[in-house]
Curated annotation (Swiss-Prot):
Gene3D superfamilies the UniProt entry points to: Putative methyltransferase TM0872, insert domain, Vaccinia Virus protein VP39
GO molecular function per UniProt: rRNA (cytosine-N4-)-methyltransferase activity
Organism listed in the record: Lactococcus lactis subsp. cremoris (strain MG1363)
S-S pairs: none
Name this protein carries in UniProt: Ribosomal RNA small subunit methyltransferase H
Enzyme class: transferase
Gene symbol of the encoding locus: rsmH
Family in the record: Belongs to the methyltransferase superfamily. RsmH family.
One GO CC term on file: cytoplasm
InterPro entries: RsmH, SAM-dep_MeTrfase_MraW_recog, SAM-dependent_MTases_sf
Major localization class: cytoplasm
């Protein structure tokens, strides 16, 4: 049985993310990233006859939500969906939901997944290399580290970790795994350190952070899934419906910003006196600059330091 005690989780940008959706009490809403259920719980407090659909592929998140949201589940105000959010449209269609009033995303790995040492997400805690958000999938960090060719590792480390020492780290991994498989998080973290110049080790922040991020993104296809899901969400939104997206690193933020820009920009032909409705932008940006955590939140929630919130509103189908 999945543990619920593991899900001690301080929800980032809780009020901002939900409040900016301008929740209608009778609306249909989606929490694409259930996690610790903080956003879901707060959004549910704003619903009367409305309904919330909460997605997560992590069984532990569902076990926790069944306890935390037990009252709302009993009242049939929320439906928990165990699925990757890239299946957003098809999963909702199975429930006869084709349009929604709003949706929120809290991207990346959740704090409880980091905190559970057995999940293999953390470079600070000894565990078998894993990093799977969905424990039923076959590809894990172990396979990426031990089976991917040198060139693929370099590409992943550079693209998803933006690490300038990608080649050196990939070469060190390649040499080490010829002797014996790299099995644990600490083993990998120590290997990464050994590949770096001494001056890099003295810099602020853990030297393995970027590489662990890159492997995690590869294992879970995080950016591919996010892009697919956000585009599906825009299509699902009713006119005037809103989408809130919290990101935690530059790759997620650039992706979100790029999608929002694509859907909120119109190239108007010269000499056109009036823009036809079908040529209007699908989205309107609610905030051009991302919303950041307040000083008050930063005092008790360290994870909020890198959080950025972007919100947009549907203008036309």
């Amino acid at each position: 049985m999945p543990k619920t005690i593991a899900f001690k989780h301080d929800t980032v940008l809780l009020h901002e993310t939900v409040d900016m959706l301008e929740v209608k009490p009778n609306g249909i809403y989606v929490d694409a990233t259930l996690g610790g259920a903080g956003h879901s719980e707060y959004l549910l407090s704003k619903l009367t006859t409305g309904h919330l659909y909460s997605f997560d592929q992590d069984e532990t998140a569902h076990a926790n939500a069944k306890v935390r949201l037990s009252e709302q589940l009993a009242e049939d105000k929320v439906t928990l969906i165990k699925s990757n959010f890239r299946n957003l449209k098809s999963a909702l269609a199975e429930l006869d939901i084709t349009k929604i009033d709003g949706i929120l995303y809290d991207l990346g790995v959740s704090s409880p997944q980091f905190d559970d040492s057995q999940r293999g997400f953390s470079y600070k805690k000894e565990a078998r290399l894993d990093m799977r958000m969905d424990q039923s999938q076959t590809l894990s960090a172990y396979e990426v580290v031990n089976d991917y060719p040198y060139e693929a590792l370099v590409r992943i480390f550079f693209r998803y970790g933006e690490d300038k020492f990608s080649k050196q780290i990939a070469r060190k991994i390649e040499q080490s795994r010829k002797i014996k498989p790299i099995e644990t998080t600490i083993e990998l973290a120590d290997l990464i350190k050994s590949a770096l110049p001494q001056k890099e080790l003295k810099k602020k922040g853990h030297p393995a952070k970027r590489i662990f991020q890159a492997i995690r993104i590869e294992v879970n296809d995080e950016l591919g899934a996010a892009e697919e899901s956000i585009e599906q969400a825009i299509d699902l939104l009713k006119v005037d419906g809103r989408i809130s997206v919290i990101t935690f690193h530059s790759l997620e933020d650039r992706l979100t910003k790029s999608i929002f820009k694509e859907y909120s920009t119109v190239n108007v032909p010269k000499g056109l006196p009036m823009l036809p409705k079908e040529m209007e932008a699908k989205l309107k940006l609610i905030n051009r600059k991302p919303v950041l955590a307040s000083e008050e939140e930063l005092e008790f929630n360290n994870r909020a330091h890198s959080a950025k919130l972007r919100v947009a509103q549907k203008q036309r189908d």
